[in-house]
Design a protein with these regions (language model features):
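Generic N-terminal leader/processing signal
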Residues: 1, 16, 62-63
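A short, hydrophobic beta-strand-centered structural micro-motif
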Residues: 31-35, 56-98
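C-terminal/domain-edge helix-coil "capping" segments
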Residues: 19-24, 105-166
């Protein structure tokens, strides 16, 4: 009986604990500041090409790019290109940062009817892809990963902003 109860409790914890933490965090976002970080490669031409591709994808969905404003979308790309070994590795991380208020300060400002000025920068969305590729296909595979992450972001953005589909 005791083992059965433990199994039921653990099952319920797993079922309820798998919800996405970033649900509805992208609601109302129409302007973003793009930050692109490439670590491990010194290829400025490829970097500019990828940034242009990302900006064009945002224009396709009518998301405007602005300078020095929150929310900020960050593409962090870490590449370990090994010409000696057969495989090279990469990590592509897409994160969205926005201002937030701690729960304590939020409730305190409700009680005081004053708007708090203690804003924090918080990660409101994040997804990443870790992959391996040959050196010949490394750029192509990193670009495919960027495109997959962008598509995942847009899917979540449409879920949070359903009226933007029309």
């Amino acid at each position: 009986m005791k083992n059965w109860m433990i199994i039921v409790i653990l099952s319920l914890a797993c079922i309820t604990g798998k919800d996405r933490w970033y649900s509805k965090n992208l609601k109302g976002i129409e302007e973003l500041h793009l930050e692109f970080n490439l670590i491990g490669l010194d290829d400025s031409v490829w970097e500019k090409r990828v940034v242009s591709f990302i900006e064009l994808r945002f224009l396709e969905y009518d998301l405007r790019m602005v300078e020095n404003i929150m929310p900020k979308i960050s593409f962090d790309i870490h590449v370990l290109d090994s010409r000696v070994e057969k495989l090279s590795s990469f990590l592509v991380v897409l994160s969205v940062y926005n201002y937030s208020v701690s729960e304590k300060n939020y409730y305190k400002s409700l009680a005081d009817t004053l708007v708090t000025k203690r804003l924090m920068t918080s990660k409101v969305f994040s997804h990443e892809i870790l992959g391996q590729s040959s050196s010949q296909n490394l750029y192509r595979d990193v670009e495919k990963s960027i495109n997959q992450l962008f598509s995942f972001f847009i899917d979540q953005w449409y879920k949070d902003n359903p009226m933007k589909q029309f």
